Structure formats: structure tokens, C-alpha cells
Amino acid sequence: MIGRLNGILVEKHAPEIVLDVGGVGYELQVPMTSFYELPELEQSATLYTHFVVREDAQLLYGFITKQERALFRLLIKTNGVGPKLALTILSGMTAGEFVSCVERDDIVTLVKLPGVGKKTAERLVVEMRDKLKSLLEASVGNEREFMLQTNYTAPAANAEEDAISALVSLGYKPPQASRAVSKAYKEGMDTETLIKLALKSML
């Protein structure tokens, strides 16, 4: 089991990255909340990982914090939620926003995420409530702050096509992704900010 990787960030194509660790390039899928916190290319990065083995693939998921990985692991234990959907959920909202949705029984916001139907949203609220309470109780200081954070800031990068591609990778239909990006785009806007605003507009 690979629990953590530290290496040089050599590729960034949301939601995938490649981390060079001792000459070996590890391809990881990361939620957008972690993607926004990554350094520039050729800089050192540390990611906490979750390894998934399927019949047709071996996939590595990466997270900037242990708490986001813990939330991802709780999500995939929910009936009907696989790694791809968990990644989409953590890309569409911060950990704090998700916690807030569960606490408020906010099914309406959850079903706006691609792949989350009414039944899945209801299961998430019911099954995650006690699990999240335990996770929050076990978190202290910065860990607890992260779990309750309801916004994030995105650093600089590139543009519209990349943003649309990232949204499609997360499960949104191309026309929907294109409309959201066009609506959010302003001249000079970087890719991460554009993705963030487009995601917000669809919730």
C-alpha cells in the first residue's frame, strides 16, 4: 500500500497529475480542492494517497491533507459511491461545504453534483452523519479547521479548454461544462479560478 508520495510535480492536467519520485512517474487523480493547493510544475509536492485495484486498472488518488483522504475513504464506504464519484464530490465542494450539507440534510445541493441522484444524496446524508461526527471529534487544530473550511483560493495557471476538459473528466456533460465555463470566464482568468467558479455556478 502506498500511503504518501513526495516528489517533483512534472504534469498538471486537472484532475490528473504526475509526480516524479526517484525517477518514477506516478500518475494520480486528485480532487480539485487539492489541485488548487498544488505548487507550480518542477516544484516539490507531498500527497497522501489511496490505492485502488480494479480488474481493469490500478488507480492512485492523491490528497494534500490526511483529512481530505480520510473523508474520501468515508465516502467510498457509502453504498453506491465509488472512487470516481467521491472525487467528483470533493471537487464540487470543500470538505466544510460537504459537512454542512450532511448536517443540514441538504439533498438539493448534493443532487446538483454529477452522478449524485436523490437516492445517493439521501444515503450520503444518512450514512455519513455519524461518520463525520467521529471524524470531526478526532480532528484538532488545523485538521478541524480544514474539515470546516467552506472556501478556498486558487493559485494561477492557464484557460477555457483546460477548464472544460477538467469538468468533463469529473463527470459533467461537455455542453454543460462548456456553458458553465463560458458563463464564468473573464479575460485573464486562470484555469483553477475558472474551474472553481464554473463548479460553483452548477451547485
Curated annotation (Swiss-Prot):
Leader sequence residues: none
Subcellular localization: Cytoplasm
Region (Domain II) location: 65-143
Superkingdom of this protein's organism: Bacteria
Keyword field: Cytoplasm, DNA damage, DNA recombination, DNA repair, DNA-binding
Region (Domain III): 155-203
Keyword presence, Lipid biosynthesis: no
Record flagged with keyword DNA-binding: yes
Chain spans, region Domain I: 1-64
GO biological process, one term: DNA recombination
Region (Flexible linker) location: 144-154
Molecular function per GO: ATP binding; four-way junction DNA binding; four-way junction helicase activity
Entry's Gene Ontology cellular component terms: cytoplasm; Holliday junction helicase complex; Holliday junction resolvase complex
Subunit composition and interactions: Homotetramer. Forms an RuvA(8)-RuvB(12)-Holliday junction (HJ) complex. HJ DNA is sandwiched between 2 RuvA tetramers; dsDNA enters through RuvA and exits via RuvB. An RuvB hexamer assembles on each DNA strand where it exits the tetramer. Each RuvB hexamer is contacted by two RuvA subunits (via domain III) on 2 adjacent RuvB subunits; this complex drives branch migration. In the full resolvosome a probable DNA-RuvA(4)-RuvB(12)-RuvC(2) complex forms which resolves the HJ.
Family: Belongs to the RuvA family.
Comment on protein domains: Has three domains with a flexible linker between the domains II and III and assumes an 'L' shape. Domain III is highly mobile and contacts RuvB.
Function of the molecule: The RuvA-RuvB-RuvC complex processes Holliday junction (HJ) DNA during genetic recombination and DNA repair, while the RuvA-RuvB complex plays an important role in the rescue of blocked DNA replication forks via replication fork reversal (RFR). RuvA specifically binds to HJ cruciform DNA, conferring on it an open structure. The RuvB hexamer acts as an ATP-dependent pump, pulling dsDNA into and through the RuvAB complex. HJ branch migration allows RuvC to scan DNA until it finds its consensus sequence, where it cleaves and resolves the cruciform DNA.
HAMAP family: DNA_HJ_migration_RuvA
Record protein name field: Holliday junction branch migration complex subunit RuvA
Species assigned in the record: Shewanella denitrificans (strain OS217 / ATCC BAA-1090 / DSM 15013)
